[in-house]
Swiss-Prot record:
GO terms for molecular function: G protein-coupled receptor activity. It holds the Pfam family 7tm_1. It comes from the Eukaryota. InterPro entries: GPCR_Rhodpsn, GPCR_Rhodpsn_7TM. This is Probable G-protein coupled receptor 150. Belongs to the G-protein coupled receptor 1 family. The lineage of its organism: Eukaryota, Metazoa, Chordata, Craniata, Vertebrata. Residues 402-427 are annotated as: Disordered.
């Protein structure tokens, strides 16, 4: 009879008195020697995804800083003289554009950053969060585009018909905001919340949360939606911008072609002729600003919508087309439009800033000196001082008295003053 306390018949058991850490130890008793999985931090995503988030953060900070500066400059400077109703209308449109850029950058960049950093919402709030995010993105993009087109239209009417009927800026600005919200409703119904499966090894918080509904549908559904988005968000504003900027360029070209007439040699026959009308320098600056805003809108939004249309007509399956690398990169370029718009305004309209005047004066010294030397060399042969020009010749009234007796001609009047240097501030 065997001893019941023999070591040969005792079942091997773990020493329960010793604390064990199964999550960080190796299972040496297993045949394959596999490690027991322990708690690990969630993956952080690919480097391109992190770079995308960094660029979105930089653009968001730049957009908030620039547009806040524009709003403080236009809304807070009430201590100066009243600039007049026309300037008030232009300032009102610029304030609306700055507010639209703030709304667009916050709706696009801030919503994406919050979505990626905070992680997946609850399933009950997933669809609502997706639709609200797309509503903010589409409406902000549309409001900014509509106000850029409205500014170009207002400048076109102010240049072509200065004394004509004024544009109802407040009503059209309210209509632009309302139209942007209405046209942004369809994008809210083409997305749904879909959390990634838990078995996915390379899933990070916020990955593929909002997906389109076009994966199980035929391809033409996605193509129709892409066409609608391109026409409403890009083609229609570009058509209005092309009409307004085309008229602006025509007026600018006509007024510029009449300007060389003023530089022709002075003759007595031109004494009674009136000089051609030219655009004021401040109006030229606002015209240039409108053209720059239009070109910036086209340059920033054209690659994004081209990538969207290319993804819709590609041979790839219509899955998560919102998350393609090219479309995501073009979205960053589109959001950059909201950060560059205030810089354009500050470049063209900051003429009364003391630092800006010093910078323009320092940069314009060289070209001003060259223009003055050219004018002096051109007029040196036939231009003298006024008293030397008159003495010892008789004065004008003496010449008029002697015209009938001696038949002498009236001395020509002095030449007009040369135009100011082009480097001087327009303000």
């Amino acid at each position: 009879m065997e001893d019941p306390f023999s070591l040969a018949i005792l079942n091997p058991a773990s020493n329960l008195s010793v604390p064990t850490q199964p999550s960080w130890s190796l299972n040496l008793t297993s045949e394959q020697g596999a490690s027991v999985p322990g708690p690990h931090s969630p993956p952080r995503g690919p480097p391109s995804h992190r770079i995308h988030l960094v660029f979105l953060g930089i653009i968001l900070v730049a957009a908030v800083a620039g547009n806040t500066t524009v709003l403080c400059r236009l809304c807070g400077g009430s201590s100066g003289p009243w600039p007049g109703p026309k300037r008030r209308k232009m300032d009102f449109l610029l304030v609306q554009l700055a507010a639209a850029d703030l709304y667009a950058s916050g709706g696009t960049a801030l919503s994406q950053l919050a979505w990626e950093l905070l992680g997946d919402p609850r399933p009950a709030l997933g669809d609502l969060a997706c639709r609200l995010s797309h509503l903010l993105q589409a409406s902000g993009r549309g409001a900014s585009a509509h106000l850029v087109a409205l500014i170009a239209l207002e400048r076109q009417l102010a240049v072509r018909i200065p004394q004509g009927p004024q544009l109802p800026a407040r009503a059209l600005a309210a209509l632009s905001w309302l139209l942007a919200l209405l046209l942004a409703l369809p994008p809210t119904f083409v997305v749904r919340w879909d959390a990634p499966p838990s078995s996915t090894a390379n899933a990070w918080p916020g990955k593929h949360c909002c997906r389109g509904i076009f994966a199980p549908l035929p391809r033409w559904h996605l193509q129709v939606y892409a066409l609608y988005e391109a026409i409403v968000g890009f083609a229609a504003p570009v058509a209005l911008l092309g009409f307004s900027c085309g008229h602006l360029l025509c007026v600018w070209w006509q007024r510029g072609s009449q300007a060389p007439v003023a530089r022709m040699p002075w003759s007595p026959s031109m004494a009674r002729a009136s000089l051609p009308s030219a655009l004021p320098q401040a109006k030229v600056q606002s015209l240039k600003m409108s053209l720059a805003l239009a070109l910036l809108f086209v340059g920033c939004d054209l690659p994004y919508f081209a990538a969207r249309l290319a993804a819709a007509w590609s041979s790839k399956p219509a899955g998560d087309w919102e998350r393609e690398s090219l479309v995501a990169a073009m979205r960053v370029l589109e959001v950059a439009n909201s950060a560059i718009n205030p810089l354009i305004y500050l470049f063209f309209q900051a003429g009364d800033c003391r630092l800006w005047r010093r910078l323009r004066r320092r940069l314009g010294v060289l070209c001003c000196v060259r223009e003055e030397e050219a004018d002096i060399s051109e007029w040196a042969g036939d231009h003298q001082a006024l008293h030397r020009h008159r003495w010892p010749h008789p004065h004008y009234h003496h010449a008029r008295r002697e015209e009938r007796n001696q038949g002498c001609l009236r001395p020509p009047p002095p030449r007009p003053r040369p135009p100011p240097c082009s480097c001087e501030s327009a303000f």
